[in-house]
Amino acid sequence: MSTKGEHHTVPLSVLLKRESANEKIDNPELIHGQHNQSKKGEDFTLVKTECQRVMGDGVTTFSVFGLFDGHNGSAAAIYTKENLLNNVLAAIPSDLNRDEWVAALPRALVAGFVKTDKDFQERARTSGTTVTFVIVEGWVVSVASVGDSRCILEPAEGGVYYLSADHRLEINEEERDRVTASGGEVGRLNTGGGTEIGPLRCWPGGLCLSRSIGDLDVGEYIVPVPYVKQVKLSSAGGRLIISSDGVWDAISAEEALDCCRGLPPESSAEHIVKEAVGKKGIRDDTTCIVVDILPLEKPAASVPPPKKQGKGMLKSMFKRKTSDSSSNIEKEYAEPDVVEELFEEGSAMLSERLDTKYPLCNMFKLFMCAVCQVEVKPGEGVSIHAGSDNCRKLRPWDGPFLCASCQDKKDAMEGKRSSGDRHSSESD
């Protein structure tokens, strides 16, 4: 019998049930479809719905949609499809609530991409792959990407929002500068006699991309660190289109959306692929995934045509906000149903992407490598903040930490060690 003023502790199981019940009410309905026309057989997709964040409860679910466009063979694309999700989830502590889990995703995605690349390269296979990896948790959409496959969003309010980056050297000046600063050479294919043809490529290797998973023979300045964007849709929902470059080299985002308006996802994906192939023919594998995020009470139908008046509002909402401009934007667009940008970062520097300045500073476990999740023994871990003149000493307040192997990879990706050093050491 309790005394007056005594505080009762609510069991964790009860709290989880309450949270799960709320999530079930809040979660939208997801309807998806995909289509492919193959040329080389190097495009692969991953679709997993109702993955469980809390194992066994059947309610705290999220969905995953991945597109892997391989090159120089399919090994990297297949390996990434089979291992990336597990590597991302391994980087997220198991005791987080829903909001913390979502906040942890951006850094976990970075860790998962780097671990997948590191593990695949240890197999000494030279193929590579682009990755566009989408996680939908409730109304929050998190996208991580390397390469030139893309993901776009058409919110129900209207407009087009690009959720991925294009890492082709031809169009990305910032990436060209990074590659050359790290020791790579950027130029077109030289056919002899001073004649150069084709898109800009990275040499050695001749890859057109600055970021990918795999590509052991190109150099470590071609990094697996993804561009990550995270947005929260309004309760009106929206449509995602995830496609390989076989689509985007032929049609624009607006053309992709217009050619499938009024159609369900499966038919939409087929129409988009046919539209792209009809314009340029089958020059490459052409793959498309369409995902509709819908309110539960709405019928299963495609996203309605965008409202023209919504475009200006959405573009303003997605711009980076300074402390001076944020209040003005909030006053001008104080409407409840708008898309909210939660996170965006595209730096290729692993030390910046794992820095504790980002939300949820305690997401990394002490004495565990932040990338590969192996145990780091006292005295062996390297703080992500450590400079070249700092001693390798474990201190809890200096985390997160990297094991020696992941620190070595970080140094190579950031141009602190040439990729040739690794190849020579592996051949000894």
UniProtKB/Swiss-Prot annotation:
Annotated cofactor note: Binds 2 magnesium or manganese ions per subunit.
Binding site for Mn(2+) 1: 69-70
Binding residue positions for Mn(2+) 2: 69, 245, 284
Reactions accelerated catalytically: O-phospho-L-seryl-[protein] + H2O = L-seryl-[protein] + phosphate; O-phospho-L-threonyl-[protein] + H2O = L-threonyl-[protein] + phosphate
SUPFAM superfamilies in the cross-refs: PP2C-like
Cofactor entry: Mg(2+); Mn(2+)
Alphabetized UniProt keyword annotations: Hydrolase, Magnesium, Manganese, Metal-binding, Protein phosphatase
Keyword 4Fe-4S belongs to the record: no
Region (Disordered): 301-331
Top-level lineage group: Eukaryota
GO terms of molecular function: metal ion binding; protein serine/threonine phosphatase activity
Enzyme class name: hydrolase
Domain PPM-type phosphatase, chain residue ranges per copy: 24-293
Entry EC no(s): 3.1.3.16
Sequence similarity: Belongs to the PP2C family.
Identification of the protein by name: Probable protein phosphatase 2C 12
Organism name: Arabidopsis thaliana
